[in-house]
Structures are given as structure tokens and as C-alpha cells.
């Protein structure tokens, strides 16, 4: 989720399977009269029945998590996906993302036993966010198989979000969707999800950005990609994907955010694209950024620019970052426009007098707290007459609107994004998959 600058296959066996148990055969011999051979007065032996036992779910050790392997091959998933990832990884250890070693003055970290011991302290956090990442990979694989011209955006986001809820075993604030699914088309760069009743249908000429998030215990995966149906847009996608990978490459402990932005812009703007006989430079959208991520807070306080001239603040050990870039054929600057769908609670607190607004705020606190939400989710939960109450909370400053961010009409914007973690020993690109 972007940050704008201030203006059916057979399921695998699981750990929950019960051991099969049959009634133990009665080996006592019985005579024609029906009495046991042990004598007239001997009592009949009762059949013994084994009690069914459930295997205890294994507890992943810190060592198992630290030594987690990349995604194993041969995972079984249905289509559409219905098997939670916890059932696929029965040992409770989820696969790590792509590991990139630190360079230069931090290269010692790769083999430092002291730094490796530090990682063990945070093993459970790593496992939580890797679970969220694995859900993201599997859901987007499914979505990449169903997205096509003629598909409605509402059907697309509902299919994606339902799959996410199932695979992550959504449970209130413990695990679930981290923010509304962005399905921004063409010149719309970010923050568009359909409100209830939206009838928008994908067309062959569209450039679609799919930006969605998952979380476990507040540890968020924020990851996005671009879908097109015409190869004429390939150079736009290639430029943005390369720019994002450049940002990831330059990220690391002690890396300066402004230098990362300069590197991203240099790569992005070395590309151009020809559309309908006219050549367009591909430019970084200067007022969109990547960002740090904190538990339950998608925009964690630090911004990762995608143009030169940014602050020289350093990245630090233990931080999570969403490295995302946007390339545009237009003016390369976005403004807020169109009907709002994204909302998020602020830190501001004040008295709420309107009963409906007070009731809605209680629901938001319980189900989303500081996570972003959308109007469609409120409708889904039965809060279908929420607009006046929601507007009241926005007017009070308790809730903030995040309207769609748009470039110039007629332009095309592409986006790629990954979430990474600056561990003590290495940089882990948590959301990396075999697709991008």
C-alpha cells in the first residue's frame, strides 16, 4: 500500500489427522454353547477399544525457524485455494524469503555468531511474517490465473480477499487482511478498491495494479504487482520491476534513504516506451514512496523515496520496509481524486456524540484498530448504513480518508512492491516468489 508524501488436488495429510484405531479383536475362543473356554463360570472378556489420540501440534524451535528453508516444491493447494498454510506446513515452520547478504562494512554480519544468536530472540516474529508472506504468494498465484478481460473488479477483489481469509485463517486482529485490496487502473496509481455496487469491468487495454496485504499478529506483508493483457505495456512493467529490485538491492542496515531513491530514479528513467506510435519517457512518480512498516501500522514513519533529493536518514537493524516504485507515462505526480474507499484510524482522540458514530467506532476499534479498512468491508459486516457515521468520524479527525491517487488522464502507471526485513545477519525479501 503506497504512501503519498505530504502534499482441486488432494489435500496433504496434516498434523491434525487422527491416528486410525480399530477395535482390538477378541481372541477368546467360544464353545458351541456360547461360553468361553475358560469354564462355565468364567466371565466373558470385553473387547478392548483403543481411544483415538490426536497428535500434538509440533512446536517450532527458534533454531528450526532461523534455519528455515526457501519455499519447498510440490506444495499441494486446491483451485480456488482452500487449504490454510498452517495445514501445509505441519511442523509450524514457514519458508523464508529471498536472502541477500549485507555488503561493505556490514558484510561481517553474514557469519557473525553473535548476530545469529540475536536472530533467535526474534524467531517467532520471523515465523509470523513468513506465514503472512506464504499466504500472499499462494493467493496471488491463484489471482494471476483468474484475472482477465471481462472480469469485474468487485468479483476480483472478493475472490482474492476470501482466499486470503481462508489461507491465513483470519481471526480478528490476530491474523487476516492487512488493508483493502488495491485494484487501480491505468492512470490511477493507488488506493482504489471498489465500493459496494461498483460495476467496473477489466478491458484488454487496461494496466491493472494489484496491491494487497496480509498480516499475522500485526506483522504485515505489503506487496504489489502489475497485470496487463497487451504486450505493448511490457516495457513499462519491466522498468518498474527493475526499479523496485534496484531499491531492494540498495536497501540495508545503515543505507541512506535518499541514496536509495536516487538509485531507483536512475534505473526507472533509463527506460522509455512506445505506445500508438509515440515514445514516452518512463518516470518515477515523485510524490509516492515506499515506507517502513511497524506492527499494525502500514506506514511506519520512514519514507523510501523513488526520486533523488530525499532525506539521508539511515535504515536500521530490525526494521521492516515496503520497497515500492511507480513508473508513469504521464506527469509523474499524483493528486487525490475520485470516490474514497480507503479509511484508517488516526492517533487523534476526542468525544464522539453521535450514537451511530460511536457504535461504528467501537466496531472499527475491535476489528481493524490501526489497520486500514474500506466501506465494502463495513457493508459485508452488516454496517450497511455507515456513511453518515463514517463521515462524522472523519470530520472529527478520528478517521482519515485515503482517496485514490491519480496521475494525468490518459497516462499509464505500473507498480511493483516487496516487503523486506533487515535481520541482524542478512536482508530477507519476505514476499519474494517465483513470479517476481
Swiss-Prot record:
Substrate binds at residues 191, 299. Residues 1-61 are annotated as: Disordered. SUPFAM superfamilies: Creatinase/aminopeptidase, Winged helix' DNA-binding domain. Residues 16-26 have a biased composition (Acidic residues). Residues 44-56 have a biased composition (Basic residues). GO terms for molecular function: aminopeptidase activity; initiator methionyl aminopeptidase activity; metal ion binding; metalloaminopeptidase activity; metalloexopeptidase activity. Binds 2 divalent metal cations per subunit. Has a high-affinity and a low affinity metal-binding site. The true nature of the physiological cofactor is under debate. The enzyme is active with cobalt, zinc, manganese or divalent iron ions. Most likely, methionine aminopeptidases function as mononuclear Fe(2+)-metalloproteases under physiological conditions, and the catalytically relevant metal-binding site has been assigned to the histidine-containing high-affinity site. Keywords: Aminopeptidase, Cytoplasm, Hydrolase, Metal-binding, Protease. PANTHER family: METHIONINE AMINOPEPTIDASE 2. Belongs to the peptidase M24A family. Methionine aminopeptidase eukaryotic type 2 subfamily. This is Methionine aminopeptidase 2.
Amino acid at each position: 500500500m503506497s504512501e503519498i508524501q505530504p502534499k482441486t488436488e488432494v489435500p496433504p495429510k496434516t498434523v491434525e489427522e487422527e491416528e486410525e484405531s480399530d477395535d482390538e479383536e477378541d481372541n477368546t475362543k467360544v464353545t458351541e454353547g456360547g461360553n468361553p473356554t475358560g469354564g462355565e463360570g468364567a466371565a466373558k472378556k470385553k473387547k478392548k477399544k483403543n481411544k483415538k489420540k490426536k497428535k500434538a501440534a509440533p512446536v517450532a524451535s527458534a533454531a528450526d525457524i532461523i534455519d528455515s528453508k526457501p519455499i519447498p516444491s510440490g506444495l499441494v493447494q486446491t483451485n480456488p485455494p482452500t487449504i490454510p498454510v498452517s495445514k501445509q506446513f505441519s511442523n509450524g515452520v514457514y519458508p523464508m524469503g529471498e536472502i541477500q547478504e549485507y555488503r561493505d562494512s556490514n558484510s561481517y554480519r553474514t557469519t557473525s555468531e553473535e548476530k545469529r544468536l540475536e536472530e533467535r530472540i526474534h524467531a517467532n516474529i520471523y515465523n509470523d511474517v513468513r506465514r503472512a508472506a506464504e499466504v500472499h504468494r499462494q493467493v496471488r498465484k491463484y489471482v494471476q490465473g483468474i484475472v482477465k478481460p471481462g472480469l469485474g473488479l468487485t468479483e476480483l477483489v472478493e475472490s482474492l480477499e476470501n482466499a486470503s481469509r481462508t489461507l491465513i485463517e483470519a481471526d480478528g486482529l490476530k491474523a487476516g487482511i492487512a488493508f483493502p485490496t488495491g485494484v487501480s487502473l491505468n492512470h490511477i496509481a493507488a488506493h482504489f478498491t471498489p465500493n459496494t455496487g461498483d460495476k467496473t469491468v477489466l478491458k484488454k487495454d487496461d494496466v491493472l495494479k494489484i496491491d494487497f496485504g496480509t498480516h499475522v499478529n500485526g506483522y504485515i506483508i505489503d506487496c504489489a504487482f502489475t497485470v496487463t493483457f497487451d504486450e505493448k505495456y511490457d516495457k513499462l512493467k519491466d522498468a518498474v520491476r527493475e526499479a523496485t529490485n534496484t531499491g531492494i538491492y540498495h536497501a540495508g542496515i545503515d543505507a541512506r534513504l535518499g541514496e536509495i531513491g536516487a538509485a531507483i530514479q536512475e534505473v526507472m528513467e533509463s527506460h522509455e516506451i512506445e505506445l500508438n506510435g509515440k515514445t514516452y519517457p518512463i518516470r518515477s512518480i515523485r510524490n509516492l514512496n515506499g515506507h517502513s512498516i511497524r506492527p499494525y501500522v502500514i506506514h511506519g514513519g520512514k519514507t523510501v523515496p523513488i526520486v533523488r533529493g530525499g532525506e539521508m536518514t539511515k535504515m536500521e537493524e530490525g526494521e521492516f520496509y515496503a520497497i515500492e516504485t511507480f513508473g508513469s507515462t504521464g506527469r509523474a505526480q499524483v493528486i487525490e481524486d475520485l470516490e474514497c474507499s480507503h479509511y484508517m484510524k488516526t492517533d487523534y482522540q476526542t468525544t464522539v456524540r453521535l450514537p451511530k458514530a460511536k457504535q461504528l467506532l467501537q466496531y472499527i476499534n475491535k476489528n481493524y484498530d490501526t489497520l486500514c479498512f474500506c466501506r465494502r468491508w463495513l457493508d459485508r459486516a452488516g454496517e450497511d448504513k455507515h456513511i453518515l457515521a463514517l463521515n462524522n468520524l472523519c470530520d472529527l479527525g478520528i478517521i482519515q480518508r485515503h482517496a485514490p491517487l491519480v496521475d494525468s488522464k490518459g497516462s499509464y502507471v505500473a507498480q511493483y512492491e516487496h516487503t523486506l526485513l533487515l535481520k541482524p545477519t542478512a536482508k530477507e525479501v519476505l514476499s519474494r516468489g517465483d513470479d517476481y
